[in-house]
């Protein structure tokens, strides 16, 4: 039999601090409505989603404060770098996310911006709750203990 190939996913931007600053409850994949120059700029790998978040307006989910810099070769047809971008989701998904945000006090934060195997730009969106300082310290201690435990087990045998 022929070997099945793994889907080729190209990560363009990642929010590394999100897992430290937030307790992630659920993740969901969303498409993004982009212009041509935005897609080219993301492919060049210079976009950042670290300070961004998602919010609901008029029954739709929007990505706010994501920085996709201008594409240098586009001269006057360029886009605005920090404009709000519409996230493409099904109505059931939107209702679920809006319910979590309004009732449970959760936040929608982007974890990863990537291109799927078909070349479409996707955003991995997390439903999360912000951690307090003592929660961050506790998770850091737990992570450090896991590393130390691994080192001890490797050293012994």
Curated annotation (Swiss-Prot):
SUPFAM superfamilies: Small protein B (SmpB). Residues 135-151 have a biased composition (Basic and acidic residues). Residues 133-157 are annotated as: Disordered. GO terms for molecular function: RNA binding. Belongs to the SmpB family. Required for rescue of stalled ribosomes mediated by trans-translation. Binds to transfer-messenger RNA (tmRNA), required for stable association of tmRNA with ribosomes. tmRNA and SmpB together mimic tRNA shape, replacing the anticodon stem-loop with SmpB. tmRNA is encoded by the ssrA gene; the 2 termini fold to resemble tRNA(Ala) and it encodes a 'tag peptide', a short internal open reading frame. During trans-translation Ala-aminoacylated tmRNA acts like a tRNA, entering the A-site of stalled ribosomes, displacing the stalled mRNA. This is SsrA-binding protein. It comes from Bradyrhizobium sp. (strain BTAi1 / ATCC BAA-1182). The gene is smpB.
